[in-house]
């Protein structure tokens, strides 16, 4: 399932504009403040959010209306049941309509005005990576937000079946006890620490301890947060994709809505990746390499293909 065309009405600076997309890779080029980021934010809202907010309305007195033309792969015909473009059964025209900021987006088949479930739009699985995200904040095992959730999940998977392991099994208690005594002897001199009885101690959870012990390094022993932004960014993108799969897979109904199964039983999970201002992190060669590296990634153990 791919977005073939957008016709936009009353959305930010893109009011009255239309965009046609290539089936594989698209590059949005233009002057500063011309609306490139707005296009990615529009796609993110359509797929991942329930409604547009006040600042999305070019004219607050008018509704936002987006005509979305989707092109379906052969195996996806029938996803929208008997709704399709009368001139092409592999194409469907959908109107995304929101009358004001206080209501949700409604999706309607353009030709018949039949309401379409937003869960079908979510099958596009759009991943939006804006230019303000800092890769080093997510490429670690000690974060519960963003793409770092996937890395922390790897620790969860390993430890959940090994309940016998205790924190003291991982740490030299004699050395640690001396360290804690030393730290607390200094902290107790701080009046607020002393008044609130706050002291340094070890974590009680194995996962908590391990997530602080493990870091990502290269073969020259440099931590990933000390490497160049290009390396951090290019490694964060596949982690972002895997985090999205993990997030979808953990909710059975969401996963069933997201995947597409053909007649041979092959399961497909479409992914659309939107990178805002990749030139901040990547030189042109790495941008091209990244764009084509993630077109198709096989997971042989589950027969899932990620297609962006």
Segments from the language model and where they lie:
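Residues at beta-strand starts and edge strands
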Residues: 2, 15, 62-66, 90-92, ...
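Beta-strand secondary-structure signal
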Residues: 5-7, 18, 65-69, 93-95, ...
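Conserved P-loop NTP-binding catalytic core
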Residues: 40-87
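Short polybasic amphipathic segments
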Residues: 66-68, 102-109, 212-217
